[in-house]
Each structure stands twice: as structure tokens, then as C-alpha cells.
């Protein structure tokens, strides 16, 4: 039986896109898409090898944003709009890392979902 050949990654020539930063209390996920929502690159603190409570640090979010920006720039990305979702500690540092990586940030939008008194929240932690 013939060995299945892996598809070669096609270089998409896209100038502008959207960086979605999903910052939870436990992890930070950075996904860079084109304006239609098709994924170009993604990275997360966990995917970079951070484990446990180190995933939720601002430094881990910074590294995730740098990794996603680097692979998105290989597709020709130059400008990016940022949408931030979630209450995590990596929100600010991920945005700064995208700008420092050479992407021009044109807009920052907070799209954190706010319930209109929907489901009951989890009980308070007693440490």
C-alpha cells in the first residue's frame, strides 16, 4: 500500500487579519485568522510546554502570542485587529507581544461574553 503523502502547507498571501486572544484563568489561546475567520496560525501556553499554574502567567501568554505571530507572518500578515475574550491574566501581555513581534495592531476589541443572568456561577473557592 502506498504511503499517504502529507499535504504541503500552502503560503497564503494575506495582508491583514484578526488576532483572537482567549484568556481564561488557566490558559491563554491566541488564534490568528483572516478577516473571514479562516485560521492562519494559532498557539497556546499549553502547546508551548507550560504546564499547570505556569500556563496562566502573563509570560506564557506573551510566548504564545509571539509564536502565533511568527507563524502568521510567514503567510504575509502585517496588520491585525485584536479581539480579547475572557478574564485571564494574559490579556495585556499577549497584545503587547503581538505588537512587539512586528504586527501593526489597528484595533483592540473586548468581546468577553457577559450573561444577562443566565446559568448559576460556580461556588466560591475556600482556600
UniProtKB/Swiss-Prot annotation:
The keyword rRNA-binding applies. Keywords: Ribonucleoprotein, Ribosomal protein, RNA-binding, rRNA-binding. GO terms for molecular function: rRNA binding; structural constituent of ribosome. Belongs to the universal ribosomal protein uS11 family. Located on the platform of the 30S subunit, it bridges several disparate RNA helices of the 16S rRNA. Forms part of the Shine-Dalgarno cleft in the 70S ribosome. Part of the 30S ribosomal subunit. Interacts with proteins S7 and S18. Binds to IF-3. This is Small ribosomal subunit protein uS11.
Amino acid at each position: 500500500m502506498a504511503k499517504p503523502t502529507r499535504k504541503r502547507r500552502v503560503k497564503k498571501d494575506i495582508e491583514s487579519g484578526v488576532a483572537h486572544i482567549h484568556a481564561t484563568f488557566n490558559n491563554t489561546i491566541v488564534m490568528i485568522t483572516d478577516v473571514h475567520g479562516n485560521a492562519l496560525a494559532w498557539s497556546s501556553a499549553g502547546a508551548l510546554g507550560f504546564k499547570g499554574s505556569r500556563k496562566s502567567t502573563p509570560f506564557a501568554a506573551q510566548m504564545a502570542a509571539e509564536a502565533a505571530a511568527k507563524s502568521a507572518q510567514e503567510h504575509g500578515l502585517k496588520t491585525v485587529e485584536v479581539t480579547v475574550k475572557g478574564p485571564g491574566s494574559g490579556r495585556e501581555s499577549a497584545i503587547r507581544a503581538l505588537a512587539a513581534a512586528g504586527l501593526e495592531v489597528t484595533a483592540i476589541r473586548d468581546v468577553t461574553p457577559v450573561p444577562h443572568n443566565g446559568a448559576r456561577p460556580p461556588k466560591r473557592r475556600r482556600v
